[in-house]
């Protein structure tokens, strides 16, 4: 069981040993990585292929929902030794008889906490039970919870727990700010942050798919370079949005917590919580989108009076205290001392 902060190289930690143990002469699936989202599956696959570029003969397949299953069947016919997959799509292939897991000797659950929080407990259990009892099961996670420990207790044998604590060296460099606002002024205060021109790449989090679409359209109609991710999008459309975002074709990405899972962009400069997340862990996952690759990041939470009790619970969970900001009577964002915020940056 490996517990480590985001951005500490977990993929390399399991990817390098996996590649060392691949039997290139064996055409069966030997190693399996489960990830909670399509995006994370693709990212893991890309990293594994990069690590394997000097090992001729290694074949890696990526199985996820939203892509035509015929393409994935073609991958499986090439006899990959390593498979990276989301639980739902892997079960689909198993039920169709496209893949067998009885030769798997190494299985990794990446982002195990998120995967189990998303309701994949039964799917993950079925997949684990389709692998040999003597296989190695490795859990990688940023946090731990009861579901993770239940899987460990049931399916691991004398597990070793490796905890990499957040230190000054590996802790994301994120300055958190909380801004007092009112519901009717939240949109204009969002525009104030976007108009500052301090941040070139921003992620804005909202709580519902409908709000994501409406807020995105409102920003686009106002001339802002924005786009969004939501649960109803086809995988190809999601890929197009993320590719455009990474290439800088637009600067503002709006998303819900579910739609944003697995997104990995190193140079997001600011995260804005337009809505307060419903779960404490989501707050950490949100602000963790910035401050990656040892770069400094900032997060802003637009907080209304009715959300203060909920926010206090989040602060108790994260054991941190954001810097308070507010808007003056002149409509300028200021610190507690009354100093203009952006003039001091």
Predicted regions: what they are:
Residues 1-345:
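Conserved helicase RecA-like core
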